[in-house]
């Protein structure tokens, strides 16, 4: 995902920074707390890389930590369905690391631009049903820090279900016609 984002000039964190690093497995979605780790410095990062290798995980992604508001987003490509939430508002987090930047400040940002970037990424990855995380910086810029297929849609399941049906209906109708 990171290579696709870089090649297509989509906003993602730098490889280097001064506020620490995140390391996560690059071969699959995070399945346990140790699959995504914050490292305060390059020494901790080196230790974390070794830990991943010991667990049999060779493919890792390293991103510089970005200060700002964590926003979770959910979308269904081509349907207009796109929702953003601040998990820090209600402590709706999967792992405590989601609270690394503290309570959200609700920095202004363009949800339309985030949606356009997420839709572009969904097309490039052929992932029409998607979710992810972004960090909104104080200056209103954002970076996408995670992107995956078939998220939980935990905060908008009913709306998402309608959008998924809308997205799938043409393909289902076409398939049905071919079988008749």
Place the predicted regions along the sequence by residue.
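Conserved N-proximal alpha/beta basic substrate-recognition cap immediately N-terminal to
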Residues: 1-18, 28-29
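Generic beta-strand structural signal
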Residues: 16, 75-76, 136-137
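ATP-grasp fold ATP-binding core
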Residues: 16-34, 57-71
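A short beta-strand motif that forms the metal-chelation/ATP-contact edge
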Residues: 22-24, 73-75, 140-155
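Anionic group-transfer/hydrolysis microenvironments
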Residues: 26, 65-66, 74, 133-135, ...
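Phosphate-binding site of ATP-dependent enzymes
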Residues: 39-125
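A long amphipathic alpha-helix within ATP-dependent nucleotide-binding catalytic cores
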Residues: 93-144, 163-178
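A short acidic/glycine-rich loop-to-helix N-cap element
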Residues: 156-162
């Amino acid at each position: 995902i990171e290579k696709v984002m870089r090649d297509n000039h989509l906003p993602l964190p730098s490889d280097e920074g001064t506020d620490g690093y995140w390391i996560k497995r690059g071969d699959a979605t995070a399945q346990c707390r140790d699959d995504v780790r914050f490292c305060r410095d390059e020494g901790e990062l080196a230790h974390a890389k070794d830990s991943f290798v010991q667990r049999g995980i060779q493919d890792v992604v390293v991103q510089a930590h970005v200060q700002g508001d964590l926003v979770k987003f959910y979308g269904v490509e081509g349907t207009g369905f796109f929702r953003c939430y601040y998990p820090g508002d209600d402590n709706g987090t999967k792992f405590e690391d989601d609270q690394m930047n503290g309570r959200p400040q609700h920095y202004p940002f363009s949800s339309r631009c985030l949606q356009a970037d997420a839709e572009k990424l969904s097309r490039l990855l052929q992932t029409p049903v998607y979710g992810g995380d972004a960090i909104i910086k104080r200056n209103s810029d954002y970076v996408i820090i995670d992107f995956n297929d078939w998220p939980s849609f935990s905060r908008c399941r009913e709306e998402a279900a309608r959008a998924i049906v809308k997205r799938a209906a043409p393909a289902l109708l076409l398939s049905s016609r071919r079988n008749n």
